[in-house]
């Protein structure tokens, strides 16, 4: 009797374990099938994104700012805010399209840059620059010369490049309080400037136009050394070949400067300069405005898919596998900020994360003029309104 009970108990336990294993296996297979369908079938993916994951947002369901965008000389997204400059007023809106702040300031041709809670504004071709934090003015001043480029890091350090002096260009760096740290005199036109997040380095991209074929040079400057002697503070530099076009520079991971040329991506730091990616002739768009890595859109010459374009997300680590996102439709533009990517597809915008997965999709009945984004919000600009969504 005892033996029978023990055998029966073992058999029942074995059956329960088999049932549990069968259930787990069935769930795992179902998940894999659903995942495969989601990846391969656009209709199924659209259904899941729209009705299950609620990723798709129509213009009727977006928060809107009713405004004549033709009269706005600046529309810019930073942190959780949208900034609109018009008629001497800098207006700030949150993700619900509610105006949360206003600053009166005179800017003829405003340009902007931001990192985290800091926003720097400059009056291109004029003298005014100002720093804002959390929608409040921290400092403003007029500089000698004409503002051409501005940059701010996440700690509030500001770099500004000016022209129109006895030098071709002057780059000035200010601390978060607005105190001038140093000036560096440049004999060439400045294409771009950036400050590392720990404010140890300043990067300056220069273009020599004095020859028949222009050349680009990138300098890495120690900000500590520059405070005592800015002319002897360059710790590394890179000289590009003739006719290599530079589209942008961006500090990533504190010490690494990522430089985007028309045919390759370069990594520059104090110890080395190295080409980390060769772009192909099929590359239509590139962008390096990420926390880490870079993105590019390639046109596929032959494909079993309907789409002709692929978004490819790359790490700065050459050994890491790139992530691929299939683009359906004709792409108008691509933008990135930190960990978010915006694909402008005419009447819709797809927001993709750094993992290569769709975060949000916005659909409109009319052509979208432009898209601006931060790591927190995306804004679609129409002629008579701006639609805002949270990312």
Can you name each region flagged by the protein language model?
Residues 1-22:
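N-terminal Lys/Arg-rich, disordered targeting/topogenic segments
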Residues 20-39:
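Hydrophobic membrane-insertion alpha-helices, especially the h-region
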Residues 40-46, 89-91, 127-131, 166-172, ...:
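Structural motif
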Residues 53-67, 96-104, 135-142, 178-184, ...:
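A short beta-strand motif characteristic of beta-propeller blades
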Residues 66-76, 105-117, 145-154, 186-197, ...:
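Repeated scaffold domains used in trafficking and secretory/extracellular systems
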Residues 81-82, 119, 157-159, 199-202, ...:
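Hydrophobic beta-strand positions that form the internal "hydrophobic ladder"
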Residues 106-208, 212:
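Non-cytosolic head/periplasmic domains of membrane-anchored proteins
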Residues 191-308:
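Acidic, serine/threonine- and glycine-rich low-complexity intrinsically disordered segments
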């Amino acid at each position: 009797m005892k033996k029978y009970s023990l055998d029966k108990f073992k058999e029942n336990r074995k059956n329960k374990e088999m049932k549990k294993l069968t259930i787990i296996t069935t769930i795992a297979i179902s998940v894999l099938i659903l995942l495969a369908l989601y990846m391969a079938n656009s209709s199924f993916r659209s259904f899941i994104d729209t009705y299950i994951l609620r990723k798709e947002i129509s213009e009727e369901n977006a928060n809107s700012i009713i405004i004549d965008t033709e009269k706005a000389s600046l529309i810019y997204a930073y942190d959780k805010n949208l900034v609109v400059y018009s008629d001497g007023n800098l207006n700030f809106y949150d993700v619900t399209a509610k105006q949360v702040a206003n600053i009166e300031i005179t800017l003829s041709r405003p340009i902007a840059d931001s990192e985290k809670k800091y926003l720097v504004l400059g009056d291109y071709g004029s003298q005014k620059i100002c720093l804002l934090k959390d929608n409040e003015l921290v400092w403003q001043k007029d500089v000698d010369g004409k503002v051409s480029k501005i940059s701010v890091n996440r700690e509030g350090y500001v770099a500004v490049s000016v022209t129109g002096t006895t030098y071709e260009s002057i780059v000035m760096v200010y601390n978060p309080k607005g105190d001038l740290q140093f000036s560096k005199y440049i004999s060439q036109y400045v294409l771009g400037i950036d400050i590392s997040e720990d404010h140890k380095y300043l990067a300056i991209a220069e273009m020599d136009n004095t020859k028949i074929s222009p050349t680009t040079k990138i300098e890495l400057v120690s900000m500590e050394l520059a405070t005592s002697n800015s002319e002897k503070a360059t710790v590394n530099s890179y000289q590009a070949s003739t006719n290599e076009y530079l589209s942008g520079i961006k500090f990533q991971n504190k010490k690494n400067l990522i430089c985007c040329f028309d045919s390759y991506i370069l990594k520059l730091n104090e110890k080395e300069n190295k080409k980390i990616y060769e772009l192909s002739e099929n590359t239509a768009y590139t962008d390096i405005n990420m926390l880490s890595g870079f993105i590019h859109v390639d046109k596929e010459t032959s494909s079993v898919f309907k789409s002709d374009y692929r978004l490819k997300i790359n790490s700065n680590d050459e050994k890491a596998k790139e992530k691929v996102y299939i683009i359906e439709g004709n792409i108008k533009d691509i933008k990135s900020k930190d960990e978010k990517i915006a694909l402008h597809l005419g009447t819709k915008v797809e927001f993709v994360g750094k993992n290569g997965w769709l975060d949000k999709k916005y659909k409109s009945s009319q052509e979208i003029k432009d898209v601006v984004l931060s790591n927190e919000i995306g804004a679609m600009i129409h002629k008579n309104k701006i639609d805002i969504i949270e990312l």
